[in-house]
Amino acid sequence: MKNPLKTIRETKPLVHHITNWVTIYDCANITRAFGALPVMAHAPEECADMTGISSALVLNIGTLTSEIIDSMLLSAAAANKKKIPVVLDAVGVGATRFRDEMAAKILGSVRVDIIKGNYSEIAKLAGENAETKGVESTSISADPQKVAKEFAKSSSSVVVMTGKEDVISDGNRTFVVKNGHELMGSIVGTGCMAASIIGSFASVNPDYCDAAKDALCYFGAAGELAAKNSAGPGSFKVNLYDEVFNLSDEKVQAMMKVEEL
């Protein structure tokens, strides 16, 4: 898509989140800074109805409960019926059995269009050996690009692996995004924010691989710009919101660092 940010800001898509309690505020604000409209409806009594009026659904399993899983399944079924994109952020997969089982339940019960996680989380979902510490990636034994491509094929979903370099694949096309700054890893929530941004971009671009690639390029570019005037994590977070708010398609497209394999 030529001008995704302009499209988001003109159409103001509603992006429904069922996300974790640690970063919910950050996800809402970054979605709004990009120009989309965030809504966070977790109750099983209303979540499917909220999805029914939304343009994308973002699921984040960072703070799981059994009731939250029920809401996620209800909303994902509604999203599938409406044919809007479903993004699953597989936070902490590999850390506990419950988390692994619930991620597998979601993937086995509903259509997930975009599966996002760090290197360890995606490797675990793909059946590869991986080490994780809580929700942080430590190491994987396989090549990330190969893991993303093969898992995309087997899951029939777009797979997004985030890290120092982000890998995005739909099984046919594979992109490596090199935008970003190390300060993005110094604050809690940038991974969750990335899922919100991916949902926002996917809400206006039916090519979900392209949408995910663009989302990470734009977010990474904002991180690079924010870092220029930041003394540390505190000022960086404030500057990040400002840089996102002031982004333009022309500015980011001149900064894109993306390789198609």
UniProtKB/Swiss-Prot annotation:
InterPro entries: Hyethyz_kinase, Ribokinase-like
Binding residues annotated for substrate, in chain numbering: M40, G189
Reactions mediated catalytically: 5-(2-hydroxyethyl)-4-methylthiazole + ATP = 4-methyl-5-(2-phosphooxyethyl)-thiazole + ADP + H(+)
One function term, GO molecular function aspect: magnesium ion binding
EC numbers for this chain: 2.7.1.50
Domain of life: Archaea
Listed pathway(s): Cofactor biosynthesis; thiamine diphosphate biosynthesis; 4-methyl-5-(2-phosphoethyl)-thiazole from 5-(2-hydroxyethyl)-4-methylthiazole: step 1/1
Cofactor needs: Mg(2+)
Record Gene3D superfamilies: 3.40.1190.20
Residues binding ATP, per UniProt: K116, T162
Keywords: ATP-binding, Kinase, Magnesium, Metal-binding, Nucleotide-binding, Thiamine biosynthesis, Transferase
GO BP field: thiamine biosynthetic process; thiamine diphosphate biosynthetic process
Function: Catalyzes the phosphorylation of the hydroxyl group of 4-methyl-5-beta-hydroxyethylthiazole (THZ).
UniProt similarity note: Belongs to the Thz kinase family.
Name of the featured protein: Hydroxyethylthiazole kinase
UniProt source species: Methanosarcina mazei (strain ATCC BAA-159 / DSM 3647 / Goe1 / Go1 / JCM 11833 / OCM 88)
Lineage: Archaea, Methanobacteriati, Methanobacteriota, Stenosarchaea group, Methanomicrobia
Gene name as annotated: thiM
